Curated annotation (Swiss-Prot):
It comes from Shigella flexneri. Keywords: Host cytoplasm, Leucine-rich repeat, Plasmid, Repeat, Secreted, Transferase, Ubl conjugation, Ubl conjugation pathway, Virulence. It holds the Pfam family LRR_TTSS. This is E3 ubiquitin-protein ligase IpaH1.4. Ubiquitinated in the presence of host E1 ubiquitin-activating enzyme, E2 ubiquitin-conjugating enzyme and ubiquitin. E3 ubiquitin-protein ligase effector that inhibits host cell innate immunity during bacterial infection by catalyzing 'Lys-48'-linked polyubiquitination and subsequent degradation of host RNF31/HOIP and RBCK1/HOIL-1. Host RNF31/HOIP is the catalytic component of the LUBAC complex, which conjugates linear ('Met-1'-linked) polyubiquitin chains at the surface of bacteria invading the host cytosol to form the ubiquitin coat surrounding bacteria. The bacterial ubiquitin coat acts as an 'eat-me' signal for xenophagy and promotes NF-kappa-B activation. LRR repeats lie at residues 69-90, 91-115, 117-130, 131-150, 151-170, 171-195, 197-209, 210-233. Interacts with human RBCK1/HOIL-1 and RNF31/HOIP components of the LUBAC complex. The gene is ipaH1.4. Exists in an autoinhibited state in the absence of substrate protein, probably due to interactions of the leucine-rich repeat domain with the catalytic domain. Is activated upon binding to a substrate protein. It is found in: Secreted; Host cytoplasm. GO terms for molecular function: toxin activity; ubiquitin protein ligase activity. GO terms for biological process: protein ubiquitination; symbiont-mediated suppression of host NF-kappaB cascade. Its EC number is 2.3.2.27.
Amino acid sequence: MIKSTNIQAIGSGIMHQINNVYSLTPLSLPMELTPSCNEFYLKTWSEWEKNGTPGEQRNIAFNRLKICLQNQEAELNLSELDLKTLPDLPPQITTLEIRKNLLTHLPDLPPMLKVIHAQFNQLESLPALPETLEELNAGDNKIKELPFLPENLTHLRVHNNRLHILPLLPPELKLLVVSGNRLDSIPPFPDKLEGLALANNFIEQLPELPFSMNRAVLMNNNLTTLPESVLRLAQNAFVNVAGNPLSGHTMRTLQQITTGPDYSGPQIFFSMGNSATISAPEHSLADAVTAWFPENKQSDVSQIWHAFEHEEHANTFSAFLDRLSDTVSARNTSGFREQVAAWLEKLSASAELRQQSFAVAADATESCEDRVALTWNNLRKTLLVHQASEGLFDNDTGALLSLGREMFRLEILEDIARDKVRTLHFVDEIEVYLAFQTMLAEKLQLSTAVKEMRFYGVSGVTANDLRTAEAMVRSREENEFTDWFSLWGPWHAVLKRTEADRWAQAEEQKYEMLENEYSQRVADRLKASGLSGDADAEREAGAQVMRETEQQIYRQLTDEVLALRLSENGSNHIA
């Protein structure tokens, strides 16, 4: 029950006194503050506002605090105000939003608080948490240790902090997000836990997973084994253990069980190779690049690439080159080193291409050899698309069409690989994507694909999958390619440069449609589906109408230009 104790304006802070005033049972309701107490809050907050530092938006915070108190509002939002400290908080609030500030600590928390969103601050610790708390998000801070967790807590997000240990987890917890910390162990999981994110820690052993769990993200830890309970999770559950040094015995056991005819457990994602990353290069950027060139060129190449050492993702790109030299293709494919050297020369001459390539390589953080090989495929695609956009094929429509066909085929193979991944229970998705590209490289004339991969045997891609994929690519190419090509960015770049008048006419036609027909066509579509007035449906319908219009206009333009150019070259089709 609520005790009627006088609030005195002395002591360590109002909230400490309020916590003494409100001795609450779960069914208690907060007592309205007296006018004198309100006045004390306002006076305290006014002093706090005056003592702010440059950059803090304490004036906005003061107004929100005042309104919250006067209206007895349950939610207080002080997010994104660059606040470095908080004053005592209104005692009646149940939700506190303080995201994206500069806070290093928090005051005592209101006794009825249920939700705290305090992510993206500089918090080093948290105060005692009220027993009523149900949701805590304090991700992206500097917290080293958590206080006792209330029994009613259901959602805990403390990712990207500096935690070395976790307290006992409360029995009602349904979501635990602790990725990006320094944990090497984890307490037992509550029976009601449904979601777990534990990636990028140092965990060596997992507790048993409760049957209620439907999603467990465990990437990049030090796990060599998994508890047997992982196989007893529901069929629609998802477990990701990529980037862990699972033992050979564990891998074989998982593969044997998950491929059995009676398996009805979760889908488990893994990765071949160990858990090391290539984010830390063995050599400087210049040294990693020059290693691909003959000795008589290395001095000049090194001087050129020294200038790029501080560009974004340069370190990751350097590490990628180190790993690329250790792939099957680098060891076995004739002319591979010369191909890489020629590509690096093109990168040194184009800042835009270099920036794009560095960004693509930044995704290849896993040390798995086939992950590096797939990234090399993507870098080759980036180069060719860049060259097409910059004009290399302006006078060679046949070569541009061939490149377009290859990009189209690769897109379809990615769709097929994505569908295949969904059917597998124990899967390294990188191996699946690479398998379709590598094994069909010759039949589909994929110049950007490596011709060998190391771990095809664990991809789960069968000979029948490959035959079906080839047939699907050819069928879709026959029916869809010209429409796809007419919307392809590099083709548009060619048209703008070489067919400026025709391109301008097409753009004018598109804008006339937008002015005269667009609104009515969207309205008609919404009316036909009974969704008039639905904002989400309107956005979707608008995008569909725009795409259909562009498809019609650009397809007509494409047909005209290709008919002219191909007839000049003695061809009457776009094959």
